């Protein structure tokens, strides 16, 4: 099952499930979840191949929707779903295939259309970063700056880089994404 974090207590208001976008994680939504959890329970997930959730070669919207279905089923009642970007697409598939599990659906930063966006360049940049030799995330930023000029995008990607004495790694399954 997906890694899930829960904020707030169960109330009479429908729970909210927040689903992050590509290259993100539930961590991106924690501050918002905390702020809106005073009157309802809020759940944030790490989608497959992201954050602390499992890795799988199948990264289709259908498989992601099935993962979300398992989460909602474990909560034992329909939820409101906020889906951002990739998470929005997976949430749309979830709502179409399982309308009984979704009370309300809020989609952020994506439309129900087929996009021609290709993330292979960004994935290649991350895969080619020599992470084994890094001791600080700031060192990775200096290297990435040579091929990726957008400061905000670099910072976003580097949130998923784990620097550890036990070995550095991405919290992204770059081969599946």
Task: Tell me the role of every PLM-derived stretch.
Residues 30, 34, 43-82:
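Active-site loop/oxyanion-hole signature of alpha/beta-hydrolase fold enzymes
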Residues 1-17, 37-40, 76:
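Alpha/beta-hydrolase fold catalytic core
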Residues 21-24, 85:
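Active-site glycine-rich loops that stabilize anionic/oxyanionic intermediates
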Residues 132-177:
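Conserved alpha/beta-hydrolase catalytic His-Asp/Glu region
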Residues 23, 47-51, 112:
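Alpha/beta-hydrolase active-site loop signature
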Residues 83-87, 91:
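Gly/Ala-rich beta-loop-alpha elbow adjacent to hydrolase catalytic centers
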Residues 92-96, 103-135:
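Flexible "cap/lid" loop of the alpha/beta hydrolase fold
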């Amino acid at each position: 099952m997906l890694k899930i974090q829960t904020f707030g207590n169960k109330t009479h208001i429908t729970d909210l499930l927040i689903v992050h976008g590509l290259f993100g994680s539930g961590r991106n939504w924690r501050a918002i979840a905390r702020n809106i959890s005073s009157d309802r329970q809020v759940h944030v997930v790490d989608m497959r191949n992201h954050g602390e959730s499992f890795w799988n070669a199948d990264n289709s919207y259908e498989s992601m929707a099935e993962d979300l279905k398992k989460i909602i089923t474990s909560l034992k009642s329909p939820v409101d779903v906020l889906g951002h970007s990739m998470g929005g697409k997976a949430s749309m598939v979830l709502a179409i295939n399982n309308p009984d599990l979704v009370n309300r659906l809020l989609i952020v930063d994506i439309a129900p259309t087929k996009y021609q966006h290709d993330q292979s360049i960004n994935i290649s940049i991350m895969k080619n970063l020599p992470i084994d030799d890094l001791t600080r995330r700031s060192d990775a930023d200096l290297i990435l700056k040579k091929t990726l000029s957008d400061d905000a995008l670099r910072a976003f990607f580097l949130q998923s880089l784990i620097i550890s004495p036990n070995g550095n790694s991405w919290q992204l399954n770059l081969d599946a994404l």
